[in-house]
């Protein structure tokens, strides 16, 4: 059968919080089968847990943030969550000593490296997939996102930015998910923003950790980062990365096709909630044989460049 996965070892790293600008220590711990994905703030006494759940996403203004009933939050979870989805991790404890996950380089790549460093272990429990059974669509003005049945996990994402530095031919991406494809084609895409917005937000004591080290920064005419883009379609690729992380807030791999136009964290989350609220729209499924799975996860011991 296709089994659940966790980490072999505990791993730790430090980085900067995007919003606070302060040092954050991140620790990833193995967890027992059927634990799920648990985010934990260890700077509070007692520690506060945030199980991955689309209902826990209560703020999507500048990132994806989990907020509990007491108003305690943990922000900027989407890039790490995307790495967990990409590597097929089902069970993990994620500890931070701050109200946010460190931003690292603004992509999911450092988290992929961290997971590979920890090693991946299969567990004696079946991996549970969510299979989309019928179309579900969520709209907000001219923006929309939808799931339709598909025997695999496919992303069809289109953005619309009228900017000289964003090629009009590079604003749509079709991605058929596999671990190898995620690591090589998606994980390195960085978040992006406009200098005028960053300057305003920093004047409001927000995104104090934002810099050229962890984002693609644009003015009205060009990309300001000296090194430019990592690949030509990095903008839409990062939106796909964000969506993979947002959709994995259900804690399970999805079998279906996600289509979106100008979607963001909020719309991604609303679609996921709408799907899960409609019991006729999805079903649980497991696979007795690896070859039967329509979603291609790499072997646990495979090292991916």
UniProtKB/Swiss-Prot annotation:
Residues the record lists as binding Zn(2+): 79, 238, 242
HAMAP family in alphabetical order: LpxC
Associated pathway: Glycolipid biosynthesis; lipid IV(A) biosynthesis; lipid IV(A) from (3R)-3-hydroxytetradecanoyl-[acyl-carrier-protein] and UDP-N-acetyl-alpha-D-glucosamine: step 2/6
Species annotation: Vibrio vulnificus (strain YJ016)
Active site residues per record: 265
Catalysed transformations (reactions): a UDP-3-O-[(3R)-3-hydroxyacyl]-N-acetyl-alpha-D-glucosamine + H2O = a UDP-3-O-[(3R)-3-hydroxyacyl]-alpha-D-glucosamine + acetate
Name of this protein: UDP-3-O-acyl-N-acetylglucosamine deacetylase
Any one Gene Ontology BP term: lipid A biosynthetic process
Function as written in the Swiss-Prot or TrEMBL entry: Catalyzes the hydrolysis of UDP-3-O-myristoyl-N-acetylglucosamine to form UDP-3-O-myristoylglucosamine and acetate, the committed step in lipid A biosynthesis.
E.C. no: 3.5.1.108
Cofactor or coenzyme needed: Zn(2+)
GN (gene name): lpxC
InterPro entries for the chain: Ribosomal_Su5_D2-typ_SF, UDP-acyl_GlcNac_deAcase, UDP-acyl_GlcNac_deAcase_C, UDP-acyl_N-AcGlcN_deAcase_N
Record GO terms (molecular function): metal ion binding; UDP-3-O-acyl-N-acetylglucosamine deacetylase activity
